[in-house]
Amino acid sequence: MSIKVFCIGDLMLDVVAQIPTSPHELHLGNDTRTIISTHGGGAGGNVASWLAVLGNEVTMVGRIGDDSAGSAITAEFDSLGVRHKNLVIPGARSGVVVVLVDPTGERTMFPDNGANSGLHIGDLPNLDGFNAVYLSGYSPLDPSSLPGVKEMISVIRNAGIPIYFDPASVGAMKEVDLQEIKSWLQLFDCLLLNEEEAIYLTGESDLEKALDALLLDCTMVVIKRGSLGAIGKYRHGQSISVPAIAAEVVDTTG
């Protein structure tokens, strides 16, 4: 069964360098041979793309520049069937992130937000028929996008559409007051986050306690655990753990 969903969030061109060693062992100030590739990326763009691959009707809400990076991103969306409209900001440059991927598949990222800043209520599509909304945390964590994103959330909630929120990385969250971020959580129906983010938001290293703390604000919480799978829980329900599918890790960028 497919759903109709739109994703709000960051759109990036990923420049991925597969390095032969861990980042702290690189030859700084010298050369290190790598394998480099480029892909569409950004948390919002990644989720939109994979939802489309799974056969859902997906619309992307975000911003890119009128440059070659932006053209590459929209071309990838077109090939996957992701709907997009009015993404291009004239005169702006698209967001780009340089990603170092070590032999274990772990990533280290250097993002340049570019055109992603400045989302506003006018970027929101007509809400008729949508079943769900995915919101990347990178958007409200951007000060120039926060007012517009809050307006979007208000309109979406009034329309009765559930919002699934992924708060982004701890590094990004540390640039915003923690209490400010916590105040947003009550606005969402479901919280999707990893272990590090759950611990940061709650101060609880015990995942059951972290789930219960987060469920004071959200109806449902899912904590992603990498190679250990995921654990989720509804408010007043029992937690459910799902193991990860065995696979060779190549790149955890998304």
Over which residues does each language-model region extend?
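Glycine-rich phosphate/adenosyl-contacting loop at the front of the ribokinase-like
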Residues: 1-61, 68-72, 79, 243, ...
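Active-site flanking residues adjacent to catalytic metal/cofactor-binding acidic residues
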Residues: 8-9, 165, 193, 223
